[in-house]
Amino acid sequence: FKTGHSLIKARMKETHSPLGGEMSGHIFFKERWFGFDDGTYAGCRLLEILSRSADPSAVLNALPTSHSTPELNVTCAEGEPHRLTTELQALAAGTFAAPAQINTIDGLRVDWPDGFGLIRASNTTPVLVLRFEGHTPEALARIEAAMLALLHRVKPDAQVGSAAH
């Protein structure tokens, strides 16, 4: 589904999810809160959940490890991000073979067994937003290179920079 706090909250309501979040670190709770995200509250709720376990370290150690980029941006002209996203989506099927799985719900997301790449148009500014994740540093490097190669096919002058948050 698409990113953005209002869209995440709507999806949580639709699916009756008690918890939702984004890679940006925004975490939303359905119960015992006012529906907006708050880092301190999220941390306290995590501690509450961990306190119910006889071995909190085991709970955390059971979580998958991954390597990811920060949010990356490509500055574009007004209206360009959506056009570029459409072009990327059209090229993806001929570029990425199985076991890659292509998702075009919100930009272009390509999932591999060992990670994913995402390029999407920002909903608020004229930029492309990029995120890459791999189970290992090598997987991350391979996925990032593959996605950037595709991006440079539709925008050869793309300069990737870290998001200014």
Give, region by region, the residue ranges found by the protein language model.
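Phosphate-binding and adjacent anionic-ligand microenvironments
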Residues: F1-R131, T136-H165
